[in-house]
Amino acid sequence: MKLSFDSIVTKEPIRLAIIMENVIFDTRDEYGELHSESTMRKKYHEDLKPIPGAIEAFKNLNSITDLRNRKIFDVNIISTLSLTNQKSYINKIANVQKWFGDEALKKLIFCQDKSSIRTDILIDNSFKPQNFPDTNKFTLNTPYLQIRYGTDETNFYQIKSWTDNDYLDVIKKICIDLGLLVI
């Protein structure tokens, strides 16, 4: 069943965080066998290409309004800190600006510990216990709900692709289930 946003109301914008690596930008092709060598390249993150449909999905999520014409989502792009390649910050910023525009730069957040992010929902491609010091994979006691992008993990809500609008149905269902949206 397809859900519409036409009859939905939100009390305040829902904080939605999307991981940059392998959710918005495809880093798998770049990493390959030369992971450490390729990440040290001067323009590594500047050369990355968005995952198909990611630009449109980001813009779409940022433009959705509720029945009262209030913005539903506050969407941020989250990227990991690189302790070995300080130039990666400049390149990541340039890449986000190149593909997503100046407004997206205001929504780019760098962090080492994802659990420190103040968000309602995180769209990520993996769970790494080292990024959640007080959390284990079984309890997933994180401060936000997690959605997996492009994986086959069955313990999580799934978004398989940005190229169809199924991602909207997944996000909307979760928001309704959590009481963040009212029909």
Swiss-Prot record:
GO terms for biological process: pyrimidine deoxyribonucleotide catabolic process. It comes from the Viruses. Gene3D superfamilies: HAD superfamily/HAD-like. GO terms for molecular function: 5'-nucleotidase activity. It holds the Pfam family NT5C. PANTHER family: 5'(3')-DEOXYRIBONUCLEOTIDASE. This is Uncharacterized protein R758. It comes from Acanthamoeba polyphaga mimivirus (APMV).
